[in-house]
From Swiss-Prot:
Sequence ranges assigned to domain MADS-box in this UniProt record: 1-61
Subunit structure, as described in the record: Interacts with AP1/AGL7, SEP1/AGL2, SEP2/AGL4, SEP3/AGL9 and AGL3/SEP4.
SMART domains tied to this protein: MADS (SM00432)
Top-level taxon of origin: Eukaryota
Originating organism: Arabidopsis thaliana
InterPro entries: MADS-box/MEF2_TF (IPR050142), MEF2-like_N (IPR033896), TF_Kbox (IPR002487), TF_MADSbox (IPR002100), TF_MADSbox_sf (IPR036879)
The name this protein goes by in its record: Protein TRANSPARENT TESTA 16
GO MF term list: DNA-binding transcription factor activity; protein dimerization activity; RNA polymerase II transcription regulatory region sequence-specific DNA binding
Lineage of the organism: Eukaryota, Viridiplantae, Streptophyta, Embryophyta, Tracheophyta
Extra remark beyond the main annotation: The two isoforms were always coexpressed in the tissues investigated. The pigmentation of the chalaza-micropyle region is not under the control of ABS, as opposed to the pigmentation of the seed body.
Localization of this protein: Nucleus
Amino acid sequence: MGRGKIEIKKIENQTARQVTFSKRRTGLIKKTRELSILCDAHIGLIVFSATGKLSEFCSEQNRMPQLIDRYLHTNGLRLPDHHDDQEQLHHEMELLRRETCNLELRLRPFHGHDLASIPPNELDGLERQLEHSVLKVRERKNELMQQQLENLSRKRRMLEEDNNNMYRWLHEHRAAMEFQQAGIDTKPGEYQQFIEQLQCYKPGEYQQFLEQQQQQPNSVLQLATLPSEIDPTYNLQLAQPNLQNDPTAQND
Protein backbone atom coordinates (compact mmCIF):
# COMPACT_ATOMS: atom_id res chain seq x y z
CA MET A 1 0.00 0.00 0.00
CA GLY A 2 1.59 3.31 -1.16
CA ARG A 3 1.97 6.55 0.74
CA GLY A 4 -0.69 9.19 0.36
CA LYS A 5 0.06 12.21 -1.77
CA ILE A 6 0.96 15.27 0.31
CA GLU A 7 -0.59 18.58 -0.72
CA ILE A 8 2.10 21.11 -1.57
CA LYS A 9 1.35 24.28 0.39
CA LYS A 10 2.90 26.33 3.13
CA ILE A 11 2.94 24.63 6.51
CA GLU A 12 1.31 27.01 8.97
CA ASN A 13 2.64 25.40 12.15
CA GLN A 14 6.12 26.79 12.75
CA THR A 15 7.48 23.72 14.55
CA ALA A 16 6.21 21.33 11.89
CA ARG A 17 7.58 23.62 9.19
CA GLN A 18 11.06 23.62 10.77
CA VAL A 19 11.07 19.80 11.12
CA THR A 20 10.00 19.35 7.50
CA PHE A 21 12.65 21.80 6.30
CA SER A 22 15.42 20.00 8.21
CA LYS A 23 14.44 16.57 6.84
CA ARG A 24 14.03 17.70 3.24
CA ARG A 25 17.22 19.76 3.31
CA THR A 26 19.16 16.69 4.39
CA GLY A 27 17.56 14.65 1.64
CA LEU A 28 18.26 17.36 -0.94
CA ILE A 29 21.96 17.52 -0.01
CA LYS A 30 22.18 13.71 -0.11
CA LYS A 31 20.68 13.54 -3.59
CA THR A 32 22.94 16.39 -4.77
CA ARG A 33 26.05 14.56 -3.53
CA GLU A 34 24.91 11.33 -5.19
CA LEU A 35 24.27 13.13 -8.47
CA SER A 36 27.72 14.75 -8.45
CA ILE A 37 29.41 11.39 -7.75
CA LEU A 38 27.41 9.30 -10.18
CA CYS A 39 27.53 11.75 -13.06
CA ASP A 40 30.78 13.62 -12.27
CA ALA A 41 28.77 16.86 -12.26
CA HIS A 42 29.89 20.13 -10.72
CA ILE A 43 27.07 21.14 -8.44
CA GLY A 44 26.68 24.01 -6.01
CA LEU A 45 23.73 24.16 -3.64
CA ILE A 46 22.83 27.21 -1.51
CA VAL A 47 19.84 27.17 0.82
CA PHE A 48 18.58 29.86 3.22
CA SER A 49 16.02 28.88 5.81
CA ALA A 50 13.05 31.02 6.80
CA THR A 51 15.12 32.30 9.73
CA GLY A 52 18.04 33.27 7.45
CA LYS A 53 20.35 30.34 8.30
CA LEU A 54 22.66 29.36 5.42
CA SER A 55 23.19 25.77 4.26
CA GLU A 56 25.40 24.99 1.26
CA PHE A 57 26.92 22.09 -0.61
CA CYS A 58 29.55 22.07 -3.34
CA SER A 59 30.69 19.03 -5.30
CA GLU A 60 34.28 20.25 -5.00
CA GLN A 61 35.28 21.08 -1.43
CA ASN A 62 36.03 24.79 -0.81
CA ARG A 63 35.33 25.59 -4.46
CA MET A 64 32.01 27.44 -4.15
CA PRO A 65 33.43 30.90 -5.14
CA GLN A 66 35.10 29.43 -8.23
CA LEU A 67 31.86 27.69 -9.15
CA ILE A 68 29.94 30.95 -8.81
CA ASP A 69 32.53 32.80 -10.95
CA ARG A 70 32.16 30.10 -13.59
CA TYR A 71 28.39 30.54 -13.54
CA LEU A 72 28.64 34.32 -13.90
CA HIS A 73 31.21 34.07 -16.69
CA THR A 74 29.03 31.60 -18.56
CA ASN A 75 26.04 33.96 -18.36
CA GLY A 76 28.07 37.09 -19.20
CA LEU A 77 27.92 38.39 -15.67
CA ARG A 78 30.53 39.16 -13.06
CA LEU A 79 30.66 40.05 -9.38
CA PRO A 80 31.46 43.63 -8.47
CA ASP A 81 35.11 43.98 -7.52
CA HIS A 82 36.28 46.09 -4.59
CA HIS A 83 38.94 47.61 -6.80
CA ASP A 84 36.26 48.58 -9.31
CA ASP A 85 34.31 50.32 -6.54
CA GLN A 86 37.34 52.40 -5.64
CA GLU A 87 37.88 53.39 -9.26
CA GLN A 88 34.24 54.40 -9.60
CA LEU A 89 34.48 56.43 -6.40
CA HIS A 90 37.62 58.23 -7.59
CA HIS A 91 35.96 58.96 -10.92
CA GLU A 92 32.91 60.49 -9.23
CA MET A 93 35.13 62.55 -6.93
CA GLU A 94 37.06 63.88 -9.91
CA LEU A 95 33.83 64.90 -11.63
CA LEU A 96 32.64 66.71 -8.50
CA ARG A 97 35.98 68.47 -8.13
CA ARG A 98 35.86 69.74 -11.71
CA GLU A 99 32.28 70.90 -11.31
CA THR A 100 33.20 72.74 -8.11
CA CYS A 101 36.12 74.49 -9.82
CA ASN A 102 33.89 75.58 -12.70
CA LEU A 103 31.32 77.00 -10.29
CA GLU A 104 34.01 78.91 -8.39
CA LEU A 105 35.31 80.40 -11.65
CA ARG A 106 31.80 81.47 -12.62
CA LEU A 107 31.24 83.10 -9.22
CA ARG A 108 34.48 85.10 -9.18
CA PRO A 109 33.10 87.96 -11.35
CA PHE A 110 30.20 88.36 -8.90
CA HIS A 111 32.80 89.11 -6.20
CA GLY A 112 34.62 91.65 -8.38
CA HIS A 113 37.48 89.38 -9.49
CA ASP A 114 38.85 88.72 -13.01
CA LEU A 115 36.79 91.54 -14.54
CA ALA A 116 39.55 92.57 -16.97
CA SER A 117 39.06 89.47 -19.09
CA ILE A 118 35.27 89.87 -19.41
CA PRO A 119 33.92 91.50 -22.59
CA PRO A 120 31.63 94.57 -22.32
CA ASN A 121 28.42 92.72 -23.23
CA GLU A 122 29.02 90.16 -20.49
CA LEU A 123 29.76 92.97 -18.06
CA ASP A 124 26.36 94.48 -18.88
CA GLY A 125 24.69 91.15 -18.14
CA LEU A 126 26.67 90.83 -14.94
CA GLU A 127 25.57 94.30 -13.88
CA ARG A 128 21.91 93.48 -14.51
CA GLN A 129 22.19 90.29 -12.51
CA LEU A 130 23.80 92.11 -9.60
CA GLU A 131 21.15 94.85 -9.69
CA HIS A 132 18.43 92.22 -9.70
CA SER A 133 20.07 90.48 -6.74
CA VAL A 134 20.35 93.77 -4.84
CA LEU A 135 16.68 94.46 -5.53
CA LYS A 136 15.70 91.06 -4.17
CA VAL A 137 17.83 91.59 -1.08
CA ARG A 138 16.35 95.04 -0.51
CA GLU A 139 12.79 93.71 -0.88
CA ARG A 140 13.45 90.97 1.63
CA LYS A 141 15.04 93.46 4.02
CA ASN A 142 12.00 95.75 3.75
CA GLU A 143 9.69 92.82 4.44
CA LEU A 144 11.59 91.94 7.59
CA MET A 145 11.62 95.57 8.74
CA GLN A 146 7.88 95.86 8.10
CA GLN A 147 7.27 92.73 10.14
CA GLN A 148 9.36 94.13 12.98
CA LEU A 149 7.44 97.42 12.87
CA GLU A 150 4.12 95.58 12.97
CA ASN A 151 5.29 93.54 15.94
CA LEU A 152 6.46 96.66 17.75
CA SER A 153 3.19 98.43 17.01
CA ARG A 154 1.23 95.46 18.30
CA LYS A 155 3.29 95.40 21.49
CA ARG A 156 2.83 99.16 21.90
CA ARG A 157 -0.96 98.82 21.65
CA MET A 158 -0.91 96.01 24.19
CA LEU A 159 1.19 98.07 26.58
CA GLU A 160 -1.08 101.09 26.14
CA GLU A 161 -4.12 98.95 26.85
CA ASP A 162 -2.50 97.50 29.96
CA ASN A 163 -1.50 100.99 31.07
CA ASN A 164 -5.03 102.30 30.56
CA ASN A 165 -6.49 99.42 32.53
CA MET A 166 -4.02 99.97 35.36
CA TYR A 167 -4.68 103.72 35.34
CA ARG A 168 -8.44 103.15 35.46
CA TRP A 169 -8.07 100.62 38.26
CA LEU A 170 -5.98 103.03 40.34
CA HIS A 171 -8.56 105.81 40.03
CA GLU A 172 -11.41 103.47 40.85
CA HIS A 173 -9.49 102.21 43.86
CA ARG A 174 -8.74 105.76 44.99
CA ALA A 175 -12.39 106.75 44.67
CA ALA A 176 -13.44 103.71 46.69
CA MET A 177 -10.91 104.57 49.39
CA GLU A 178 -12.25 108.14 49.57
CA PHE A 179 -15.76 106.82 50.03
CA GLN A 180 -14.62 104.51 52.81
CA GLN A 181 -12.58 107.21 54.59
CA ALA A 182 -15.42 109.76 54.38
CA GLY A 183 -17.92 107.30 55.85
CA ILE A 184 -20.73 108.84 53.83
CA ASP A 185 -23.87 106.82 53.18
CA THR A 186 -24.78 107.02 49.53
CA LYS A 187 -27.77 105.81 47.65
CA PRO A 188 -27.59 102.19 46.41
CA GLY A 189 -26.91 103.07 42.77
CA GLU A 190 -25.03 106.32 43.26
CA TYR A 191 -21.55 104.85 43.72
CA GLN A 192 -21.98 102.35 40.86
CA GLN A 193 -23.14 105.15 38.55
CA PHE A 194 -20.07 107.17 39.47
CA ILE A 195 -17.75 104.23 38.69
CA GLU A 196 -19.45 103.63 35.33
CA GLN A 197 -18.97 107.30 34.41
CA LEU A 198 -15.35 107.07 35.47
CA GLN A 199 -14.74 104.07 33.19
CA CYS A 200 -16.00 105.95 30.13
CA TYR A 201 -13.14 108.45 30.27
CA LYS A 202 -9.71 107.98 28.84
CA PRO A 203 -6.67 108.23 31.12
CA GLY A 204 -5.92 111.77 29.99
CA GLU A 205 -9.47 112.90 30.84
CA TYR A 206 -9.59 111.48 34.38
CA GLN A 207 -8.28 114.59 36.10
CA GLN A 208 -10.67 116.89 34.24
CA PHE A 209 -13.58 114.60 35.13
CA LEU A 210 -12.61 114.50 38.80
CA GLU A 211 -12.29 118.29 38.95
CA GLN A 212 -15.76 118.68 37.43
CA GLN A 213 -17.17 116.25 40.00
CA GLN A 214 -15.58 118.13 42.88
CA GLN A 215 -17.03 121.46 41.68
CA GLN A 216 -20.59 120.08 41.82
CA PRO A 217 -22.12 120.58 45.30
CA ASN A 218 -24.07 117.30 45.24
CA SER A 219 -21.21 115.21 43.86
CA VAL A 220 -20.15 112.13 45.80
CA LEU A 221 -16.54 113.28 45.56
CA GLN A 222 -17.54 116.71 46.86
CA LEU A 223 -19.23 115.06 49.80
CA ALA A 224 -16.28 112.79 50.38
CA THR A 225 -13.63 115.51 50.31
CA LEU A 226 -15.37 118.58 51.86
CA PRO A 227 -13.68 119.62 55.14
CA SER A 228 -15.82 120.11 58.22
CA GLU A 229 -16.91 123.74 58.70
CA ILE A 230 -18.03 123.20 62.29
CA ASP A 231 -15.66 124.24 65.05
CA PRO A 232 -15.08 121.15 67.18
CA THR A 233 -14.59 123.37 70.31
CA TYR A 234 -18.02 125.01 70.00
CA ASN A 235 -20.59 123.47 72.37
CA LEU A 236 -24.15 123.26 71.07
CA GLN A 237 -27.04 123.90 73.51
CA LEU A 238 -30.64 123.15 72.86
CA ALA A 239 -32.97 126.15 72.88
CA GLN A 240 -35.69 125.80 75.58
CA PRO A 241 -38.17 128.72 75.59
CA ASN A 242 -39.61 127.86 79.01
CA LEU A 243 -36.19 127.96 80.67
CA GLN A 244 -35.27 131.27 79.03
CA ASN A 245 -38.35 133.00 80.50
CA ASP A 246 -38.06 131.36 83.96
CA PRO A 247 -36.61 133.82 86.56
CA THR A 248 -35.41 130.93 88.65
CA ALA A 249 -33.24 129.69 85.83
CA GLN A 250 -31.75 133.14 85.44
CA ASN A 251 -30.82 133.31 89.10
CA ASP A 252 -29.11 129.98 88.90
